[in-house]
């Protein structure tokens, strides 16, 4: 009996000491930012981290998901977060905070890794205690955990709203709801202003950034009193997420072509949405080149693109690479695909593909679609050799 009592007492003391150590780590970081939402959290986390680093903060950023990373102000090397076999656990945030403090940082920008509403509360109130909260968006996802309605998802995200701090949000149907919650917590609300994010600025990124992503990060800069010039420069210097959709300037600094790497967006809807966004930003899309990578073991996908994607992109030239291109050749010959010219490079080598491509790179968009594996991977590496170095000033 006494052994049980002593064991319980020891566990209690250890728990109290651990909590005190963690609170000491939290208190050692005057700037703590919690990025929550459904889509775009990793991008906003990276852009915000870039801003703080540019402004002179010793900042550590942390992204979550399948490729969770630690980002540091004092080295370009990112550290993958190694997880236990059971997967992500919000308790890892304690180790993140400890490492951040021991490294000498004075700011942390952390993507919220909790989905369950109760865990979101624990993440904010016990593990991070952010004084700046960011809610990227309220969309339908994880409905089984946070739903079943958008209203309940919005309610779950109120855990991100700090007390006596700042909340950065986009203007949405939940703006007034979040503002009321923030008022109850004596927190100032900053509405992200997309009018400050021009298409010309977005084209400077080598990956796809949406206006909301940049304006939310700019809102964090406003909360910290960081000037916009520093903020814009910091975002451009922020390293992209490994899974970011890359847009590379090619050949000429004055009239570059742009390679849009959409090979990994291997479904019709995503591929068309990317193309729509590329046009909206203002890239030279009047006479694009579409590169379709086909795979012998993905003939169903090739057929889907022949029916549901390529007919809806007016291309100057369509280049087919990889294997089993016949479904698209047939659709083109039947007049279903509005491309002015077709180049069927089935089974051709990367060098042979580049021989055709490099003469066509100036001042136009080259959009790679279909499949990332197979012929696309070595081609992407080769295209990178023609990348124009972006100057950030």
Swiss-Prot record:
Disruption of the gene: reported phenotype: Cells do not produce PGA.
Gene3D superfamilies attached to this UniProt entry: Mur-like, catalytic domain
E.C. code: 6.3.2.-
Keyword Manganese: no
Keyword flag Glycoprotein: no
Keywords: Ligase
InterPro entries: Capsule_biosynth_CapB (IPR008337), Mur-like_cat_sf (IPR036565), Mur_ligase_cen (IPR013221), MurCDEF_pg_biosynth (IPR050061)
A GO molecular-function annotation: acid-amino acid ligase activity
Cofactor: Mn(2+)
Xref: Pfam families: Mur_ligase_M (PF08245)
Gene Ontology annotations of biological process type: capsule polysaccharide biosynthetic process
Outcome reported for the amino acid change (mutating residue 360 to S): In strain: IFO 3336
Listed GO CC annotations: membrane
EC top class named in words: ligase
Chain's role: Catalyzes the biosynthesis of PGA (gamma-polyglutamic acid) from L-glutamate. Both the 44-kDa and the 33-kDa forms are required for PGA synthesis.
PANTHER family: PGA SYNTHASE CAPB, UDP-N-ACETYLMURAMATE--L-ALANINE LIGASE-RELATED
Name assigned to this protein: PGA synthase CapB
Species whose genome carries this gene: Bacillus subtilis (strain 168)
Lineage: Bacteria, Bacillati, Bacillota, Bacilli, Bacillales
